[in-house]
Amino acid sequence: MGYYSLTEVTAVQYAKEHGYFEKKANVVCHEIGDGNLNYVFKLDDGEKSIIIKQALPYAKVVGESWPLSIKRATIESKALQIFAKYVPEYVPVVYSHDEELAVTVIEDLSRLTITRKGLIDGEEYPLLSQHIGRFLANVLFYTSDFGLQSEEKRVLEGTFVNPDLCKITEDLVFTDPFGHYDTNDYEPELQLTIDELWSDKTLKLKVAQYKYKFLTRKEALIHGDLHTGSIFSSPSETKVIDPEFATYGPFGFDIGQFIANLLLNALSREEEQRGVLFFHIEKTWSYFVETFTKLWIGEGVEAYTKEKQWLPIILQNIFTDAVGFAGCELIRRTIGLAHVADLDEITNKETRIQAKKQALSLGKELIKYESKNADIQLFRTLFQQTVSGGIKA
């Protein structure tokens, strides 16, 4: 019968028809999605629960005037299955995928908390950086030319051509926040700071280079939208979700996005509460390097992985890219179309504006920084130089 949008009623019907619940089961269903592109339903009969996610043929945040291909749901499902091949402990189980309806049935992770919400609430996740560092190292290594034979990599790359969502990234991360575009969204009090940002030709030249890297460097399979709202956490578990932006791209992209979102949370905190965020930023990189290095030495299939001087160059390039991509993410999450609650939910207006100005300044510094070595202390140093004192709630 072709594609149709599910409702809470038809989601239950779908689940029963596909054997997830008995026909007579009393299934409670709620639409729980808070994202911009999908419906997400939680179904529970008191004994078991599942999540049904359906891609919409348009962006919810804009409406039907912004059409999107529902094929992204297939890309998301395939990405989760690729991730599970290498790091099953860090992703939800995919039970099934229906390409015609753009429906994926996945494990219910209600026992966990969306990491962004948890961090805003002051929750601590001691294993977050270890898990994300290892997740990134495994996925990026094993889907790159270093972990896959070149012909296998080319075939896999072809299955993750994702034009609609890549175009969103190109526009909303690298283009629109750096000029006069209707998609931008910001308080009038930021206008002078933004005018200065938009007139900075050196900054724009650097952003152009990072955008070009995103467009042309097909180094590994990236999640494409790895912010703290795309991660479920508890003190002992971490699960990466929502890879519908997955595509082949630069090694450093996901790392930069994740770090940027930790920095955004740090900006919302008082000075004495920021240490845990810098701990996670620095540990994410150290666990990434440790794991990537072990894989390089033990699992490398490309001939030049045997050259000892090649790995440090690769890691330096990844770090340099991560720094710049983090800067772009900071700016776009502050004045672009899709904001973050870390800043927007600061209740005091003066404090909120201050934090957003600091986010813009820090983003600019990260984009323009010329890193000579992979010094993970850089994020802490530039943060301290850019942000004087603490945020007062």
Curated annotation (Swiss-Prot):
Pathway: Amino-acid biosynthesis; L-methionine biosynthesis via salvage pathway; S-methyl-5-thio-alpha-D-ribose 1-phosphate from S-methyl-5'-thioadenosine (hydrolase route): step 2/2
Binding positions for ATP per the UniProt entry: N38, K53, E107, D108, L109, D242, P243, E244
Example of a GO biological process term: L-methionine salvage from methylthioadenosine
EC number in record: 2.7.1.100
Keywords assigned: Amino-acid biosynthesis, ATP-binding, Kinase, Methionine biosynthesis, Nucleotide-binding, Transferase
InterPro entries, A to Z: Aminoglycoside_PTrfase, Kinase-like_dom_sf, Methylthioribose_kinase
One Pfam family from the record: APH
Main enzyme class: transferase
Record PANTHER family: METHYLTHIORIBOSE KINASE (PTHR34273:SF2)
Job description of the protein: Catalyzes the phosphorylation of methylthioribose into methylthioribose-1-phosphate.
Family label: Belongs to the methylthioribose kinase family.
Annotated protein name in UniProt: Methylthioribose kinase
Protein's organism: Bacillus anthracis
Higher taxonomy: Bacteria, Bacillati, Bacillota, Bacilli, Bacillales
Gene that this sequence comes from: mtnK
